[in-house]
């Protein structure tokens, strides 16, 4: 058993890597490029607000990303209303970025938790508009089911608040979400180190998206490689099937044939 032929499928598109990474907070564009390479990711999320899409004569973040190698996932980071998020997605599509989008509609600046009411509103509009929508949402099975029913291609519940590095705070609701929806479940936000990514994947989620966990590390390139390995290891462990947890010991060697 390996992860080689274990593909992540989103809206009919196949990806070999189950790790998605962001492009913000790096010390330089060169460091970002090296970290992307080390991560092994194929889907790269880009904040539309950070991309110069109006004046192509000026330097843009996209100048540093090989779009033949990576699938761009424009995101609506910084949007607090459905209207703003929809407008941002349409601008990204008109600029030729992608019609597969990571939809974020935030509730406030303190927690960066999603405003689910506005999120559902935006998702309905974008799906009708022909977008492939991957919404960042709270770890609420009911909201995730509503997003699936709207037509979202995946759901992306948070593991913990964005940039917090707190890891997977509520694995139980993540498991319920996986039982509730049929679309891919991608844990988004809160991953702080490789063990967090492995834990998420061991739960059986389809993928993990992160930015700060890599870009904010002391050595982002090394951490990108660690996250790459952790996601693969966690996925393989999930497919292999862990032993059940129990209170008492079980001998690993048989008692038959012992010397008397």
UniProtKB/Swiss-Prot annotation:
Key word Transport present: no
UniProt KW NAD keyword: no
Subcellular location(s) per record: Cytoplasm
CDD domains: ThiG
Any one GO biological process: thiamine diphosphate biosynthetic process
Active-site residues from the entry: 102
Pathway noted in the entry: Cofactor biosynthesis; thiamine diphosphate biosynthesis
Keywords, alphabetical: Cytoplasm, Schiff base, Thiamine biosynthesis, Transferase
Binding site for 1-deoxy-D-xylulose 5-phosphate: 163, 189-190, 211-212
Enzyme Commission number(s): 2.8.1.10
Record's catalysed reaction(s): [ThiS sulfur-carrier protein]-C-terminal-Gly-aminoethanethioate + 2-iminoacetate + 1-deoxy-D-xylulose 5-phosphate = [ThiS sulfur-carrier protein]-C-terminal Gly-Gly + 2-[(2R,5Z)-2-carboxy-4-methylthiazol-5(2H)-ylidene]ethyl phosphate + 2 H2O + H(+)
GO cellular component: cytoplasm
InterPro entries linked to this entry: Aldolase_TIM, Thiazole_synthase_ThiG, ThiG
Family: Belongs to the ThiG family.
Function of the protein: Catalyzes the rearrangement of 1-deoxy-D-xylulose 5-phosphate (DXP) to produce the thiazole phosphate moiety of thiamine. Sulfur is provided by the thiocarboxylate moiety of the carrier protein ThiS. In vitro, sulfur can be provided by H(2)S.
HAMAP family reported for this sequence: ThiG
Subunit and partners: Homotetramer. Forms heterodimers with either ThiH or ThiS.
Record's protein name: Thiazole synthase
Gene field: thiG
